[in-house]
UniProtKB/Swiss-Prot annotation:
Residues passing through the membrane, by range: none
InterPro entries: Nucleoid_associated_NdpA (IPR007358)
Classification via HAMAP family: NdpA
Taxonomic source organism: Histophilus somni (strain 129Pt) (Haemophilus somnus)
Swiss-Prot/TrEMBL keywords: Cytoplasm
Family, similarity comment: Belongs to the YejK family.
UniProt subcellular location: Cytoplasm, Nucleoid
Name of protein: Nucleoid-associated protein HS_0228
Source domain of life: Bacteria
UniProt entry tagged with the keyword Ribosomal protein: no
Organism taxonomic ancestry: Bacteria, Pseudomonadati, Pseudomonadota, Gammaproteobacteria, Pasteurellales
GO MF: double-stranded DNA binding; single-stranded RNA binding
A cellular component annotation (GO) from this entry: cytoplasm
């Protein structure tokens, strides 16, 4: 798959001083865009792929967003991309300086096209140090731009923003490993607030599937069979990197009480999006029971309940018949010691 880079530029944020709560940063700005070469396109393709694999949250611009105003002026050709990047770098410097975790970094802004969709990608990348051997077989220190490990990044789907300004998913940003501060910082920089919540959408989907089966008075086995079909479809979408298409999902499961699943979901006002980003951990509950606590971790297929695994609510206990062989072997070895 190819990527078409339309405009790209790099700037740097340099830390000059730091006190207990804030950091002083300055910007080092390029005065022209980067030339579009095979190297820049290869770098952007790798950044695109790395970003795709990261855990992301969705956002939408607030009405008072300074960043959105600058972006709109750029899209309307009131200012060029270089001027947009300079103003964005200054906004980022001001916002990032409020946080103690702020550090030096290379700011990349790129407008590109991938699979007939226009994107704006923004990331703050770290530089790493390593060693190299030169032509004289001498060892020297070098530093390079780390385009595989980054936490401060966002991407705006410009095509979706243009076609549907009320969309709740045109903006995504990385949910950083260092906690809420990264998410809060980037939301403030962008002037954005939470948009689509994939976890909530997945939970609503699961509830809709459960209610759909219940209103049709299906048996336990029939209900589990429908849930297995739903899970198989969703798992297939995850495997190919696609979203759950509710209408497509509906076509993959039986019509109950002469009403398709998609029509049932709409009539009951579950608030499901037409396309839903799948959350693997949430979808597992379609076919499995799982939980952990007090030193115990359990996970088993839902179809085993009341066949090999029995729950006694009164005594808050589970009875398991037919232990997994590897678990039985561990227990036998332990009792012999």
């Amino acid at each position: 798959m190819s990527i078409i880079v339309n405009q790209i530029v790099l700037h740097q944020l340099v830390k000059t001083s730091q006190d207990e709560n804030t950091v002083q940063l300055k910007t080092h700005l390029r005065d022209e865009l980067l030339p579009i070469t095979a190297e820049t396109e290869q770098m952007m393709l790798q950044l695109h792929q790395e970003y795709h694999n990261k855990t992301k949250a969705y956002g939408v611009f607030q009405e008072t967003s300074n960043f959105a105003q600058i972006l709109n002026r750029t899209l309307e050709n009131d200012i060029d991309f270089l001027a947009f990047s300079h103003q964005s770098a200054e906004l980022l410097r001001q916002e990032l300086g409020k946080y103690s975790f702020a550090n030096d970094g290379t700011l990349i802004l790129c407008q590109y096209n991938f699979l007939a969709t226009d994107y704006l990608f923004i990331a703050l990348l770290d530089s790493r140090y390593s060693m190299l051997v030169d032509e004289n077989l001498e060892i020297k220190q070098t530093h390079y731009l780390d385009i595989t490990q980054f936490d401060i990044a966002c991407r705006i789907n410009l095509t979706e923003l243009h076609l549907d300004a009320k969309s709740t998913r045109y903006l995504t940003f990385i949910k950083g490993r260092v906690g809420r501060k990264i998410a809060d910082f980037f939301m403030d920089f962008l002037g954005a607030e939470e948009g689509l919540n994939p976890q909530v959408q997945n939970q609503c989907l699961l509830q809709a599937v459960s209610d759909y089966c219940q209103q049709a008075d299906l048996t336990k086995e029939q209900t589990q069979a429908v849930k297995k079909q739903v899970f198989d479809y969703c798992k297939g979408q995850i495997n190919v990197g696609e979203e759950i298409v509710v209408r497509e999902l509906s076509a993959n499961i039986p019509t109950l009480n002469e009403q398709s699943f998609v029509d049932f979901a709409v009539s009951q006002n579950y608030g499901l999006e037409e396309n839903i980003p799948p959350v693997r951990t949430a979808l597992k509950s379609l076919t499995k029971f799982s939980g952990s606590g007090k030193g115990i971790t359990l996970s088993f297929d839902a179809e085993l309940l009341n066949s090999r695994i029995f729950w006694d609510e009164a005594t808050d206990s589970l009875t398991i018949t037919g232990l997994p062989p590897n678990l039985r072997d561990q227990l036998q070895r332990q009792t012999k010691e």
